Structure formats: structure tokens, C-alpha cells
Amino acid sequence: MGRGRVELKRIENKINRQVTFAKRRNGLLKKAYELSVLCDAEVALIVFSNRGKLYEFCSTSCMNKTLERYQRCSYGSLETSQPSKETESSYQEYLKLKAKVDVLQRSHRNLLGEDLGELSTKELEQLEHQLDKSLRQIRSIKTQHMLDQLADLQKKEEMLFESNRALKTKLEESCASFRPNWDVRQPGDGFFEPLPLPCNNNLQIGYNEATQDQMNATTSAQNVHGFAQGWML
């Protein structure tokens, strides 16, 4: 009569648990050794007890080489499959960006008044509202720029006015400093010039009353003009 089926569950008795662990561990190590010898397989076995004690078996001379081989086989496949996931993610991102670019290009054409036949009434109203808002913003910015330019011109005008007034004041001060030198004159500076004496260059041989009267009139006129010219100087 065969053995009945043993239920697998934690052994509550501590002593029985330790005895069972020792038996099963030895059997597992034996099976690993037999597998490596019979099948020429590279086998590595690592067992930790409930107290943290290490039990190991390796069919090769170094456990680390077997572990490195295991890491290359396990994580290398993950690294190989990872680029495909990154490629898929990049492609999805490309599709999203392409859709955004298409929407922006269509919106740009609509703002230019193109491809409006495909839009509904509601979309046309939204487009009209957007254009009105853009125009108001453009006018506001344009007005602000003009006000800024006007303020700059007013500042330049004030600066020029102040500079002109300073130059005018300096010129008046310079003229005031030179005026006394022109107003004050000494008696012996030659301000009054002597009147020229009348002179008759005609040589008279004989006496003629008409000629004498004409000469007297000319001399009188010369005296008057000479006095006026000297007084004007």
C-alpha cells in the first residue's frame, strides 16, 4: 500500500522543521549534483535557512561566473526588448506632435481666410471672435507704441528747449560783459573826426561874376554836406 498524499504546509514544530529542512536540503543538493553529472549541465544552487545560513552548490569552479552568465541571459533579453518599447513610445509621441502641427497649420490657413468652406457656423463664429480679439490686441499694442514714441519726442523737445534757453542765457551774459567797453569812450580816442576844409581846385585867371556866384554856391553846398558827413561819422 503506497504512501498517502502529504499536505504541503509550514511545519509548526521547530525541531521537526529543522530535521525536515536538513533532509530536504541534502536531497536537493544531491539532485543538483546528479543533474550536473548525468546531463553535463551547469547547475548553481543557493539556499538560505530561516536563520540566514547559506548553503550553496555549483557545478563549476566559481559561483560568480555562473551568476554573471545568469545575469547576461536574464537582463540582456530585457535590454534587447527595451529599445522596441522606446521606439514605440517615440512613434506615439511623433503621432501626437504631427496631429498638433496639422491643427496649427489648419488654424493658420483659417486665419488667413483659406479653407473656410469646411468649417461649421459655430467654428466660423469662434474664428471671428478670435480675429476680433487679435485685432483689439494689435491696436492696443500699436497705440501704446505711438504713445511711447510721443513721450520720447516730448522729452527730446524739453531737452532741446532747456539747452536753447541755457545757450541764450550764456549769450546774453557774454553780450552784457562786452557792452561797457563799447559805451565808455575817452575824449582823446578820435571819436570826433575833423571836418574837411573846403577847397576849390579851379584856377581863376580873370574875374567873372556869374562864375564867382556859381563857385560860391558850390562851396556853400560842400560846407553843408561836409558838416553833415562829419557829424554822421
Swiss-Prot record:
GO terms for molecular function: DNA-binding transcription factor activity; protein dimerization activity; RNA polymerase II transcription regulatory region sequence-specific DNA binding. PANTHER family: SERUM RESPONSE FACTOR HOMOLOG. Residues 87-177 form the K-box domain. Residues 3-58 form the MADS-box domain. It comes from the Eukaryota. Gene3D superfamilies: Transcription factor, MADS-box (3.40.1810.10). InterPro entries: MADS-box/MEF2_TF (IPR050142), MEF2-like_N (IPR033896), TF_Kbox (IPR002487), TF_MADSbox (IPR002100), TF_MADSbox_sf (IPR036879). Keywords: DNA-binding, Nucleus, Transcription, Transcription regulation. SUPFAM superfamilies: SRF-like. This is MADS-box protein CMB1. GO terms for cellular component: nucleus. It is found in: Nucleus. One of its GO terms (biological process) is positive regulation of transcription by RNA polymerase II. It holds the Pfam family K-box.
